[in-house]
């Protein structure tokens, strides 16, 4: 019998959008073009054209003791070459951004190898070897996972995900890393992800618009699709909550079993 991953519960469009993100067989829709050079500028880890910094020799040049796990697992390219670890971090507006922190974490773990990811309420970081990071970042920025207005590339001072959008639909950014170009109708980055000014602005394209965001978002909202309208998702959450509460706090659920283990029949 072949097991088919379900990814996440739910019968609504929100749940389906989440499953698309996590499913490695689903190909993200490409919505914009960002050059490799521009992406490197926004990441801010190295200058365009600069060689990758290394933290150890290439694996082929290193002597290791025999290790069956190492022989079984193919290292990613950055690890093979000894490239250092770097990151990209996103903040996602609660106003129908395409992705959100836990969705990102699950998506990264399903789709990419060699990643370390950290989840907080308003931001999501992904760390990996810099060489591989740039390729992954390009996919995350050029596709439907990213909206220039409601998704922010923010390595520091990430606040803004829960604040109201401005008159152009942009999420608040205390460091003002990006601005709205009224002539083009595009969002342009004028600073890198930690707030250092760029020599030239980087065009991230046109915001997706409110109607499109409501179609592709992975966030349940009362003014779009409420979680309580998704019976299957609610049922699973309630089951988890009940199990953790009753079992975790030992409220008579395992009393008989515990007595047997202690020899108190």
From Swiss-Prot:
Its EC number is 2.8.4.1. Its cofactor is coenzyme F430. Binds 2 coenzyme F430 non-covalently per MCR complex. Coenzyme F430 is a yellow nickel porphinoid. Methyl-coenzyme-M reductase is activated when the enzyme-bound coenzyme F430 is reduced to the Ni(I) oxidation state. Pathway: One-carbon metabolism; methyl-coenzyme M reduction; methane from methyl-coenzyme M: step 1/1. Coiled coil: none annotated. It is an enzyme of class 2 (transferase). Coenzyme M binds at residue 123. Keywords: Methanogenesis, Transferase. It comes from the Archaea. GO terms for biological process: methanogenesis. InterPro entries: Me_CoM_Rdtase_Fd-like_fold, Me_CoM_Rdtase_gsu, Me_CoM_Rdtase_gsu_sf. The keyword Transferase applies. Pfam families: MCR_gamma (PF02240). GO terms for molecular function: coenzyme-B sulfoethylthiotransferase activity. Belongs to the methyl-coenzyme M reductase gamma subunit family. Component of the methyl-coenzyme M reductase (MCR) I that catalyzes the reductive cleavage of methyl-coenzyme M (CoM-S-CH3 or 2-(methylthio)ethanesulfonate) using coenzyme B (CoB or 7-mercaptoheptanoylthreonine phosphate) as reductant which results in the production of methane and the mixed heterodisulfide of CoB and CoM (CoM-S-S-CoB). This is the final step in methanogenesis. MCR is a hexamer of two alpha, two beta, and two gamma chains, forming a dimer of heterotrimers. This is Methyl-coenzyme M reductase II subunit gamma.
């Amino acid at each position: 019998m072949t097991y088919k991953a379900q990814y996440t519960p739910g019968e609504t469009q929100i749940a389906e959008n989440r499953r698309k993100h996590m499913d490695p067989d689903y190909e993200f829709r490409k919505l914009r073009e960002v050059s490799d050079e521009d992406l490197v500028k926004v990441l801010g880890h190295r200058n365009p054209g600069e060689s990758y910094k290394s933290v150890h020799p290439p694996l082929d040049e290193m002597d290791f003791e025999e290790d069956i796990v190492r022989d079984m697992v193919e290292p990613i390219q950055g690890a093979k070459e000894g490239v250092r670890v770097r990151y990209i971090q996103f903040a996602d507006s609660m106003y129908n951004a395409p992705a959100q922190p836990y969705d990102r974490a699950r998506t990264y773990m399903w789709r990419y190898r060699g990643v370390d990811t950290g989840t907080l309420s308003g931001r999501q970081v992904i760390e990996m070897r810099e060489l591989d990071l740039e390729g992954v970042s390009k996919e995350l920025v050029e596709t439907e996972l990213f909206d220039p207005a409601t998704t922010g590339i923010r390595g520091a001072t990430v606040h803004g995900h829960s604040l109201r959008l401005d008159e152009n639909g942009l999420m608040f950014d205390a460091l003002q890393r990006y601005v709205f170009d009224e002539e083009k109708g595009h969002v342009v980055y004028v600073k890198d992800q930690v707030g250092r000014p760029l020599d030239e602005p980087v065009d991230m394209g046109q915001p997706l618009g409110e109607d499109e965001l409501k179609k592709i978002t992975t966030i349940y909202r009362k003014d779009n699709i409420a979680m309580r309208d998704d019976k299957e998702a609610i049922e699973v959450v309630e089951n988890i909550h009940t199990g953790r509460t009753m079992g975790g706090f030992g409220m008579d659920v395992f009393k008989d079993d515990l007595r047997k283990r202690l020899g108190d029949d």
